Amino acid sequence: MSKGKSWTFTEVRPDGVVGFVPGSNAMNMAQGIAIYLSVFKAVRGSGAKVPFPGREHGYHSTHSDTFQDILAKMEIFAAVNPDKCGDGGVFNVADGQTVTWTQVWPRLCEHFGLVGSGPADGSVPMEEFVKQNKQAWDDLAEKYGLKANLVEEQGWEHTHFMLVDFDFDRQYDLSRARSVGFDEQIDTAEGYFISWDRMRAAKILPPA
């Protein structure tokens, strides 16, 4: 399409995006996890053990999350470097090294004052647990003046898919982005923490 034209284009490919939006987004995995952990803490108390809501092999499989700021920086990099990234160049973008939920889940739970552990038989799916304990969320929302309808508008099917069904190794090759000089990276759990801080400032989440 761009051949012979004054413009060019780049295709930027993230894996699962972790980030913040001011309204609800059906594919906001970070928001779904945060709502679940907030309700879990309200119901079970600080220090409670939270089993990973997926399968055992999914808990150990590798993946490459993409924090929204890393994605945005790659898109800006491509826009201002058409000589390196144009002509239909395709670039994977992710936080950095691949991770497993065994590395990330305990840290996410710890952020909420909980103890993350591996999958456990008989665990209630995230979306069911939240719906069964909706009053606990409503109490938090009233206490902290949170936005309305967050549970109802959360894309629980997507959150379930990312943690439960998307349970195979998916290592993202970042070598092409690195070869043109894009070296931005972030610790995967830190991407969640920053996103959650932004959600709290926007009255989407209660204090941790």
Region roles according to the model:
Residues 15, 122, 190-191:
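Residue-level "edge-of-site" marker
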Residues 71-160, 165, 173-175, 179, ...:
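Mid/C-terminal beta-alpha module of Rossmann-like enzyme folds, strongest
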Residues 18, 193-195:
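Short secondary-structure capping/turn micro-motifs that flank functional sites
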Residues 58, 179-185:
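Aromatic-glycine-rich donor-binding/catalytic loop that engages nucleotide-sugar donors
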Residues 65, 98, 185-186:
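Short, solvent-exposed loop/helix junctions and linker helices
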Residues 1:
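N-terminal Rossmann-like NAD(P)+-binding domain of SDR-like oxidoreductases, especially those catalyzing
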Residues 4-73, 77:
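NAD(P)-dependent short-chain dehydrogenase/reductase
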